[in-house]
Regions:
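Long, amphipathic alpha-helical coupling/dimerization segments that relay conformational signals between
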Residues: 2-8, 60, 64-165
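N-terminal low-complexity or simple alpha-helical regulatory segments
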Residues: 1-87
Length: 165
């Protein structure tokens, strides 16, 4: 299949990134604008769009999309170490998803004129992808904040106990 979405994302990377950053700066529900430099804020966008473009071009199934999101787990780790709160990461990803959907409605129609179902399928795959990115962020934050607790080994089935007379 031609690399239509990947090349579309590459062609419009800078204006897309600026549009998304403007959304982040305008959103008063996060401190991302004061917490991160512009470079820190946007450094993950090319990698996210590259992975998503590949998944859309290949018409990936849900399992492949989950694996693609898992490969981007480093994004959530970086945000955790930068001191970004989990709700801010979630808001950041929601804004990125919204900006991407707006972009796809405006720009991808030309790619899918022959079959409008392609755009619908791309939007559905993108939605799954961003849901999985949120899941990965929650997992990273949960595992990073969890205290180290010693665990005992498990034996199954448990040994039989003798009855006490």
């Amino acid at each position: 299949m031609p690399r239509r979405f990947s090349s579309l994302f590459r062609q419009h990377l800078d204006p897309f990134t600026r549009a998304w950053a403007d959304e982040v700066y305008a959103d008063r529900r996060t401190d991302l604008a004061t917490l991160l430099t512009f470079r820190e804020l946007v450094e993950h966008v090319p990698e996210v769009l590259e992975e998503l473009g590949r998944l859309l071009d290949e018409r990936a199934d849900a399992e492949e999309i989950c694996e693609g999101a898992r490969r981007l787990r480093g994004y959530a780790r970086v945000r955790f170490h930068q001191g970004v709160l989990i709700d801010e990461v979630a808001r950041e990803l929601m804004l990125l998803r919204g900006t991407l959907f707006e972009f796809l409605w405006q720009e991808a129609r030309g790619l899918t004129e022959d079959d409008p179902r392609l755009l619908r399928d791309a939007l559905r795959r993108a939605e799954i992808f961003f849901d999985e990115l949120l899941v990965e962020a929650v997992l990273v934050y949960a595992s990073s904040l969890r205290p180290v607790v010693p665990t005992r080994g498990s034996v199954w089935p448990p040994p039989r106990r003798r009855r006490q007379p």
